[in-house]
Amino acid sequence: MNIYAVGGAIRDELLGVPVQDRDYVVVGATPEQMAAQGFRPVGKDFPVFLHPRTQEEYALARTERKTAAGYHGFQFHYAPDVTLDEDLARRDLTVNAMAREVSPEGELVGPVIDPFDGQADLRARVFRHVSDAFVEDPVRILRIARFAARFADFTVADETLALMRRMVDAGEVDALVPERVWQEIARGLMEAKPSRMFAVLRECGALARILPEVDALWGVPQRADYHPEVDTGVHVMMVVDYAAKQGYSLPVRFAALTHDLGKATTPADVLPRHVGHEGRSVDLLKPLCERLRVPNECRDLALVVAREHGNLHRVMEMGAAALVRLFERSDALRKPARFAEMLQACESDARGRLGLDAQPYPQAERLRVALAAARSVDAGAIARGIGNDTEKIKEAVHRARIEAVAQALEIGE
């Protein structure tokens, strides 16, 4: 048998970026031979094995044939006579269809095996499909978009983009399972330039199918005195990229993506103002999260940011009572870590505007000081002093928090 490192590891090595995971293909072996050498089978649809020492994945060389719509509609063929070139031919992009042989000691040896000119496309910074079989797997649309977010200086070849459009028009994207769509969107959000992912998805028409609420934001005007970039879609991409540049968490980046969804449904006769867009954003966000089965942590932060971001921007005008009500609505007193992420999302919103990425955001420090003061109130001591009257306790604690915030900020109630 011969073992080869394949795919992203070879690509990243040639690009000079850190290799995170290595995938291996085994040519000339059977499942029985792999098991005899201590490899543990883990593949459900085709033979994949874990190395007995490193626990890395090794797959038998295979070919595949489309048999039904969607991500799972494939029939796989694996046998000792399947060649490395045949295995590489089923891969999505030329830059991912390269290999190097692995020695018995686990070292990469010999030249790069590159039957589809992936090295030339790497130099040209182009994502190009290996063959027309690309159209058989709709996940590849999401993968290319995610790669664009990681390698922001790459472009998609015209002929590849044409295939992607054909797949979208044929309804292939509609057959994707929600969990896989979310997985790829989430991974793309965590890349260096998430806006590139959404640009590619828009260009091929896929964004309108998988995230129509986001796609609808382009072309919606905002007030130029607040938003020099004017276009809401452009603004949201700037917000997401700012959050990515700061290294913020996935929940923060998802909240950045979805905070202004309601602007797409603003009545045309009131544009470019967007009064009440926060509530409309929440109304759109709830079914989106349900449809894609967004994890609770991401959903909950996104909902509270969508609802409250306008209020957070206006905190310099608020008295102590309004600030305490904001903390209570946002559950900040019980969940200060989540509130810190709210601040990150709102700061990204404020700085995700043309020419304003270094704009001061004093609201964040004011809210941090105010929340610390509100949380310093000893609710237990107040309760012990009052007794069993729950309503009186609640009112007294609320009043004490207002007084603490007013004192900390030296403002009126």
Swiss-Prot record:
Co-factor binding comment: Magnesium is required for nucleotidyltransferase activity. Nickel for phosphatase activity.
Reactions catalysed, as given in the entry: a tRNA precursor + 2 CTP + ATP = a tRNA with a 3' CCA end + 3 diphosphate; a tRNA with a 3' CCA end + 2 CTP + ATP = a tRNA with a 3' CCACCA end + 3 diphosphate
UniProt binding sites for CTP: 8, 11, 91, 143, 146
Residue ranges crossing the lipid bilayer per the database entry: none
Highest rank taxon of the organism: Bacteria
Keyword Transport assigned: no
GO biological process: RNA repair; tRNA 3'-terminal CCA addition
Keywords, sorted A to Z: ATP-binding, Hydrolase, Magnesium, Metal-binding, Multifunctional enzyme, Nickel, Nucleotide-binding, Nucleotidyltransferase, RNA repair, RNA-binding, Transferase, tRNA processing
InterPro entries, per database record: CCA_bact (IPR012006), HD_domain (IPR006674), NT_sf (IPR043519), PolA_pol_head_dom (IPR002646), PolyA_RNA-bd (IPR032828), tRNA_CCA-adding_enzyme (IPR050124)
Keyword Nucleotidyltransferase part of the UniProt annotation: yes
E.C. numbers: 2.7.7.72, 3.1.3.-, 3.1.4.-
Matches recorded under Pfam families: HD, PolyA_pol, PolyA_pol_RNAbd
Free-text comment about domains: Comprises two domains: an N-terminal domain containing the nucleotidyltransferase activity and a C-terminal HD domain associated with both phosphodiesterase and phosphatase activities.
Role noted for this protein: Catalyzes the addition and repair of the essential 3'-terminal CCA sequence in tRNAs without using a nucleic acid template. Adds these three nucleotides in the order of C, C, and A to the tRNA nucleotide-73, using CTP and ATP as substrates and producing inorganic pyrophosphate. tRNA 3'-terminal CCA addition is required both for tRNA processing and repair. Also involved in tRNA surveillance by mediating tandem CCA addition to generate a CCACCA at the 3' terminus of unstable tRNAs. While stable tRNAs receive only 3'-terminal CCA, unstable tRNAs are marked with CCACCA and rapidly degraded.
UniProt similarity note: Belongs to the tRNA nucleotidyltransferase/poly(A) polymerase family. Bacterial CCA-adding enzyme type 1 subfamily.
Protein name: Multifunctional CCA protein
